[in-house]
């Protein structure tokens, strides 16, 4: 708990003076005002995060948290639970979606076993930080204890801190865990006061009947556990997931270290809701990636108050959307660093 508290204490507001200078520079680059749209806003945000009008994000990593979910036994997923461990090992082989997309920007993919149901070979290349062998069935009781949730948050903090110590300047969040759209929808239902029926989607290939069953399970989990919407730790402990808490920890660590962090899709946005509930200033360090095809995604991004960068009907997870947006973040840096102002170019208008 001390690590979590200290991390939260370190999170500061963005540097407004640097942002003002960055805005003035962007407004005077050799182009019509606002002609590069949200790329200009992103450059200003990066300046405020890094305290320089010449931000760089050369060293990039996506931390992929992997864990299983006890609620799987309620029939809420369209794929076998074994996919979690198979895909977790595939991250090491470099053959998953996020690995392929990450190659575009030279991004390091870091898979972390924070709660996979099976034991993984410690020499396989996955970072072993297992809290427990998957969550408990939240339809019958808490997904995990409060202490386990705090520990999962702190695992995310520790992994992110290590990568930042090693020189990473841009982080992304990813996940792997069959059943985690159920946990994410439960979190969103609690924090946004939504009826699960309104925001429950197909996840990994559910039928219409399966979606109805999933919504009913989520409603039952909330009724059984009565999570406190004003306490993010209580919410993620009772109806969340280990990988969701881990991603929230990554976001908190990024903010504490003044490192931009790209939020992937629906599950990562649920993690962002937890992180921001623990420290609202964390939101200023988040860079949204894509509008997920998952039905609750729009509600989640609206509740968080972020606007996705791209709309491509993605719903893979893994950090795949973050990987696609990394080049956009780099482009924002190149724009403010490589384009001259009218004065620098000797142009009078």
UniProtKB/Swiss-Prot annotation:
Reactions catalysed according to its record: 5,6-dimethylbenzimidazole + nicotinate beta-D-ribonucleotide = alpha-ribazole 5'-phosphate + nicotinate + H(+)
Matches recorded under SUPFAM superfamilies: Nicotinate mononucleotide:5,6-dimethylbenzimidazole phosphoribosyltransferase (CobT)
UniProt keyword annotation of S-adenosyl-L-methionine present: no
Pathway(s) annotated for this protein in UniProt: Nucleoside biosynthesis; alpha-ribazole biosynthesis; alpha-ribazole from 5,6-dimethylbenzimidazole: step 1/2
Source domain of life: Bacteria
Known function: Catalyzes the synthesis of alpha-ribazole-5'-phosphate from nicotinate mononucleotide (NAMN) and 5,6-dimethylbenzimidazole (DMB).
Protein's UniProt name: Nicotinate-nucleotide--dimethylbenzimidazole phosphoribosyltransferase
Source organism of the structure: Alkaliphilus metalliredigens (strain QYMF)
Upper lineage: Bacteria, Bacillati, Bacillota, Clostridia, Peptostreptococcales
């Amino acid at each position: 708990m001390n690590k979590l508290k200290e991390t939260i204490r370190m999170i500061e507001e963005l540097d407004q003076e640097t942002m003002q200078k960055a805005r003035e520079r962007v407004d005077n680059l050799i182009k019509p005002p606002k002609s590069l749209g949200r790329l200009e806003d992103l450059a200003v945000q990066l300046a405020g995060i890094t305290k320089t009008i010449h931000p760089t994000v050369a060293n990039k990593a996506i931390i992929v948290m992997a864990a299983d979910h006890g609620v799987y036994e309620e029939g809420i997923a369209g794929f076998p639970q074994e996919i979690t461990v198979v895909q977790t090992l595939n991250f090491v082989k470099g053959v998953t979606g996020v690995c392929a997309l990450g190659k575009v920007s030279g991004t390091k993919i870091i898979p972390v076993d924070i709660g996979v149901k099976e034991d993984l070979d410690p020499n396989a290349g996955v970072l072993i930080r297992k809290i427990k062998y998957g969550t408990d069935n939240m339809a019958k009781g808490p997904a995990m204890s409060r202490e386990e949730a705090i520990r999962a948050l702190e695992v995310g903090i520790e992994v992110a801190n290590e990568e930042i110590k090693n020189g990473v300047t841009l982080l992304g969040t990813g996940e792997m865990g069959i059943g985690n759209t159920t946990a994410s929808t439960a979190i969103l239902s609690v924090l946004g006061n939504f009826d699960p029926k309104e925001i429950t989607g197909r996840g990994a290939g559910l039928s219409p009947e399966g979606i109805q069953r999933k919504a009913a399970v989520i409603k039952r989990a909330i009724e059984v556990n009565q999570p406190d919407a004003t306490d993010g730790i209580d919410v993620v402990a009772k109806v969340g997931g280990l990988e969701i808490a881990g991603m929230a920890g990554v976001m908190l660590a990024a903010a504490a270290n003044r490192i931009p962090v790209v939020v992937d899709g629906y599950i990562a946005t649920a993690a962002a809701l937890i992180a921001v509930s623990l420290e609202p200033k964390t939101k200023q360090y988040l860079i949204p990636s894509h509008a997920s095809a998952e039905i609750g995604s729009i509600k989640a991004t609206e509740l968080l108050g972020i606007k996705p960068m791209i709309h491509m009907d993605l719903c893979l997870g893994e950090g795949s959307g973050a990987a696609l947006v990394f080049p956009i973040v780099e482009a924002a840096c190149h724009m403010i660093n490589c384009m001259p102002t009218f004065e620098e170019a000797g142009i009078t208008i």
